[in-house]
Regions:
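Class I SAM-dependent methyltransferase Rossmann-like catalytic core
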Residues: 2-26, 30
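Short helix-loop-beta connector
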Residues: 33-47
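Class I SAM-dependent methyltransferase SAM/SAH-binding core
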Residues: 47-98
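A short acidic, Gly/Pro-enriched loop at the edge of an enzyme's catalytic core
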Residues: 97-109
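A short SAM/SAH-binding and catalytic strip from SAM-dependent methyltransferases
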Residues: 106-120, 135-137
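Conserved Class I S-adenosyl-L-methionine
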Residues: 145-167, 173-225
Length: 225
């Protein structure tokens, strides 16, 4: 499985280089729109919870939006420790199966690439709130798979199925990026499920690369009560 501290730092360094900035910026814009569209008569900041926040790359960016009080949690202690250094949000260690928050506590809930716990997500979301979930698009990291596999395949674009929340909107965020170092290639590989199910002989194909061009492709879905 590797060293959790090393993997957390590797993930942080990769994201800090801006490869996934298009997704970060799209999430920030959604938060800005929520704040600007809030009724003028409503007092106080909007509350946001980022589920499985990792090392806080997206959380801190969303939390920096004026008028937002952001919180993020992760099961990994090292992830939370790194996230706390970013600021612009309050971070804590928790399990998504039992989120330590009151019913309806958050105006916005965000969940990027994490398992979908319908019951808990719906519970902590305010009655008029929005839940944003992010899943990989069909061509996400296709360039990586072209190197790893003789017959690369497109991702199934599977949105979470839920009976407690209603899908009200979707948007795609896509770009083409060039990973500039072997460390970046290895870091993004470790962030994918392919890392754990790819044969060692196929992994060696990546080890010989110094740069890699690939699509990134995300789907952001909005759910409400």
């Amino acid at each position: 499985m590797g060293d959790p501290k090393s993997q957390a730092r590797s993930r942080r360094d990769f994201l800090n280089r801006g490869y996934y900035a298009p997704l970060r910026d799209a999430m920030v814009e959604l938060v800005r729109k929520q704040v600007s569209g809030r009724a003028a008569s409503t007092n106080g900041p909007m509350t946001l919870l980022d589920i499985c926040c990792g090392e806080g790359y997206y959380t801190s960016a969303m939390g920096a939006v004026p008028g937002v009080d952001a919180y993020g949690f992760d099961l990994g202690k090292e992830m939370v420790r790194l996230a706390a250094k970013r600021g612009d949000a309050a971070y804590f260690v928790a399990n998504m199966k039992d989120i330590p928050a009151a019913d309806g506590a958050f105006d916005m809930v965000t969940e990027l690439f994490a398992p979908f716990n319908e019951r808990e997500f719906a519970r902590v979301l305010a009655p008029e709130g929005s839940l944003y979930t992010v899943v990989p698009g069909a061509r996400h990291l296709f360039g990586l798979k072209e190197v790893l596999y003789d017959t690369p395949y497109l991702n199934d674009e599977k949105l979470p199925k839920t009976t407690e929340l209603e899908l009200v909107g979707m948007q795609r965020v896509s770009a083409n990026i060039t990973l500039q170092t072997q460390a970046d290639i290895e870091a993004v590989f470790q962030m994918t499920p392919y890392y754990y199910r790819t044969r060692p002989s196929d992994k060696e194909r990546l080890a010989n690369l110094d740069t890699l061009q690939t699509d990134i492709d995300f789907i952001i879905a909005e759910y409400r009560h």
